[in-house]
Design a protein with these regions (language model features):
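C-terminal regulatory/oligomerization modules of transcriptional regulators
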Residues: 96-155
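Conserved segment of winged-helix/HTH DNA-binding domains
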Residues: 73-98, 113-122
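A short alpha-helical element within helix-turn-helix/winged-helix DNA-binding domains
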Residues: 28-38
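Basic amphipathic alpha-helical segments that dock to polyanions
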Residues: 17, 47-52
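Short alpha-helical segments that sit at the start of domains
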Residues: 1-14
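Beta-hairpin "wing" of winged helix-turn-helix
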Residues: 55-70
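Key DNA-contact positions within bacterial/archaeal DNA-binding proteins
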Residues: 42
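Short amphipathic alpha-helical elements of helix-turn-helix/winged-helix folds
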Residues: 13-20, 84
């Protein structure tokens, strides 16, 4: 699995929506998401429309319009998001559980490469299925509290 720019932007946009999530119908304006995460607005609109069609976000039209998570952040996993934006989590399609395609090896059941790729897939899936947007928000808050190290400074 390689996270594309589109996938990264989707996660960053959803992080904003998760941090601002409330049980009421309040929304976050797309311009605000764009500015807070430095994402081009046109590209962000496409990503959010895609996430809307997946049922991850919902929108409200009009002057007071914007986007919000459709479910609480505790109920949206990184796997939900990445599978929709990027496709399979598996590094090769012959080990994908949701997007399986036969590979060209003579015997899949005895392929050493496939065996390692399956272990890789299992590790990725275990993490992505466990981490929710709520946990991502918690991590972001903790990281924001940490002092910058000398290697974080750029001259």
């Amino acid at each position: 699995m390689k996270l594309s720019v589109r996938g990264e932007y989707a996660l960053r946009a959803l992080l904003v929506l998760a941090r601002d999530y409330q049980e009421d119908d309040s929304v976050v304006r797309i311009q605000e998401v764009s500015e807070r995460q430095n994402i081009p607005k046109r590209f962000l609109e496409q990503i959010l429309n895609d996430l809307k069609s997946a049922g991850i976000v919902e929108s409200k039209r009009g002057v007071a319009g914007g986007y919000r998570l459709r479910r609480p952040p505790e109920r949206v996993t990184l796997a939900d998001i990445i599978r929709h934006i990027e496709g399979p989590l598996a590094p090769v399609s012959c080990v994908s559980e949701k997007f399986y395609e036969k590979c060209s090896c003579p015997d899949e059941s005895r392929c050493a490469i496939r065996s390692v790729m399956k272990e890789t897939r299992d590790a990725i899936v275990a993490i992505m299925d466990r981490v929710t947007l709520a946990e991502l928000c918690d991590r972001a808050r903790r990281l924001e509290q940490e002092p910058l190290s000398a290697s974080d400074f750029v001259i």
